[in-house]
């Protein structure tokens, strides 16, 4: 059961603007068991589910090499399964008009700050990866906690009307932090916490396996947000030195590919935080230049890249570093007891 708004008026500063509601009942994916009606053996469908494939959309995102690696699925069976899936989902060409129509299923989740929402074109977008990088205490994790709550708001209040999955690689998730944020939005804290599933990852392999296990949950329940805080930390620990850099980047690319597929398969917003490293080529006019960790592999995976930095007091500054549909601009926001909010003069 999703969290409900309290009857009393919210004490938050956010101006909630109503918008045309989205049909939450509309199927955004085809369940894998629909293959049975297409003549696929129920036992083979079960093998796909055991391998973490729960939708026909997700099936078509796997290579035949990966599928034939599933125990009990021969090349002939895989060909038949893929042929059946192609009848249920269209992974071919569509017109630009159809692509525009498909974009209408995208939800933009409020950050809690009107200025930050406007910078992002309405909020954090589903079916996309939003990366926030910056130094410690720049507001990345605070935004993650605020999104845990705002995602559960109704869509006509700029929420996602869905649940949240949180993968924590640095031990920074604080459930007690959720309570005042939920109260600020006029929501029941207990219900909000019940709609967040949380896992602490300790190795990069553990982090990847946690992602694999999400498909089963997301195919059954309405999730709208996946948080990975932070995406790079365990890779920097588990791989050391230039000798392991190529292997690290390959494993990182595999994990990022999985994040992209989750975002598009289930129409969820993926919000991941990233660390920064020194940039020797940053220029002589910049004091202590920094750049996001992860290299080109991470840069190409993120749909929207945001650079966070500290302002005066509790104020923080967010800059659009890279995005396909947003201009390079900045917004000032503030960290409050109730989460991310507009900055006070």
From Swiss-Prot:
Chief subcellular location equals nucleus
> Where is dsDNA annotated to bind?
236, 242, 248
The UniProt annotation places ATP binding at: 134-141
**Transmembrane spans:** none
* A GO cellular-component term linked to this record: condensed nuclear chromosome
One GO biological process this protein is involved in is: DNA recombinase assembly
The Gene Ontology terms for molecular function here are:
ATP binding; ATP hydrolysis activity; ATP-dependent activity, acting on DNA; ATP-dependent DNA damage sensor activity; DNA strand exchange activity; double-stranded DNA binding; single-stranded DNA binding
Q: Which Gene3D superfamilies match?
A: 5' to 3' exonuclease, C-terminal subdomain, P-loop containing nucleotide triphosphate hydrolases
Keywords of this entry: ATP-binding, Cell cycle, DNA-binding, Meiosis, Nucleotide-binding, Nucleus
Compartmental location? Nucleus
- Function (record text): May participate in meiotic recombination.
Q: Which family does it belong to?
A: Belongs to the RecA family. DMC1 subfamily.
Q: What is this protein called?
A: Meiotic recombination protein DMC1 homolog
**The species this protein was found in:** Glycine max (Soybean)
């Amino acid at each position: 059961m999703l969290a409900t708004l309290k009857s009393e008026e919210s004490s938050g500063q956010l101006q909630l603007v109503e918008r045309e509601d989205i049909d939450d009942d509309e199927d955004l994916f085809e369940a894998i068991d629909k293959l049975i009606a297409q003549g696929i053996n129920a036992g083979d469908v079960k093998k796909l589910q055991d391998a973490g494939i729960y939708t026909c959309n997700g099936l078509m995102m796997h290579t035949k090499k990966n599928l034939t690696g599933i125990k009990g699925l021969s090349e002939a069976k895989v060909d038949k399964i893929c042929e059946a899936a192609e009848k249920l989902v269209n992974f071919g060409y569509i017109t630009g008009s159809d692509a525009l129509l498909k974009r209408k299923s995208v939800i933009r989740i409020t950050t809690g700050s009107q200025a930050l929402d406007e910078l992002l074109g309405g909020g954090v977008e589903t079916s996309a990866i939003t990366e926030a990088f910056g130094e410690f205490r720049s507001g990345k994790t605070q935004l993650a906690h605020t999104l845990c709550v705002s995602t559960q708001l109704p869509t006509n209040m700029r929420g996602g009307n869905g649940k949240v999955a949180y993968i924590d690689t640095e031990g920074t998730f604080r459930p007690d932090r959720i309570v005042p944020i939920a109260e600020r939005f006029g929501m029941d804290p207990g219900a909000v916490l019940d709609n967040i599933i949380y896992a602490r990852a300790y190795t990069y392999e553990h982090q990847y396996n946690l992602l694999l296990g999400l498909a089963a949950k997301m195919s059954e329940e309405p999730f709208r947000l996946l948080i990975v805080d932070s995406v790079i930390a365990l890779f920097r620990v588990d791989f050391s030195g230039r000798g392991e850099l190529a292997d690290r980047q390959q494993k990182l690319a595999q994990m990022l590919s999985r994040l992209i597929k989750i975002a598009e398969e289930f129409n969820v917003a993926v919000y991941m935080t990233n660390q920064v490293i020194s940039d020797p080529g940053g220029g002589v006019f910049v004091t202590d230049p920094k750049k996001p960790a992860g290299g080109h592999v991470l840069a190409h995976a993120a749909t929207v890249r945001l650079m966070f930095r500290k302002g005066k007091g509790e104020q923080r500054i967010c800059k659009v570093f890279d995005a396909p549909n947003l201009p390079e601009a900045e917004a000032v926001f503030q960290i409050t007891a109730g989460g991310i909010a507009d900055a006070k003069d």
